[in-house]
Amino acid sequence: MVSDTDTTTAIAQPDETHDVALTSWLKSANQHPDFPIQNLPMGVFRTHDLPPRCGVAIGDSIVDLAKLAASSPFDGLAGEALSTLTGPTLNPFMQLPPNYASAFRLALSRSLRADSPMEALIRKTLISSHDVEMCLPCSIGDYTDFYTSIHHATAVGKLFRPDNPLLPNYKWLPIGYHGRASSIVVSGQPVYRPNGQVLRPEAIEPVMLPSEKLDYEAELGIFIGSPSPQFSP
């Protein structure tokens, strides 16, 4: 068993799980360009015979957290956190206070390190990353878009107000807007042109057509864990 009795508060700074000297009993994790033991990113995956489930990437494998939870390997906060990771999304885990996530990460890191007594148990939960398909990690109902690039705001403003592109309030308010998010997919999915009504020149009635000009932009999206109370930022 791995206990987290020494991890009871949120960890704001890098801790022992980020130690560059750490190595794992899983050889593919050592010197891995993306998923060494210092990373341990979480996500949701599925296989041809397993439904969507939570996992952690390590080397060329994924730790099946539902299978790991069945053996109750961790005590305290880490164990409680693991119990929220048996479903098809990370939402229940993300709603926990930060110290739960820190405790879980620490316990998992210790179990994956070289000479860990938990090697045999963890090996039974590993699935090759080549045999999985990644899924959306969370159930996404809506989003808040923060307008944070002053260069982008100025460029857009010039289209509408060439002489006054950046309004004064931009530098004083966290400009943001809220909307629904119904078409988010994981990487590698085909992009479909949206359909809309188009009124051709000289036409009297519009027609429904796929978009003939498709623009795109790159944005940074982040997941924020615990929801804020209603009417509070």
Regions found by a protein language model. Name each.
Residues 62-63:
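Short edge-strand/loop segments of extracellular domains
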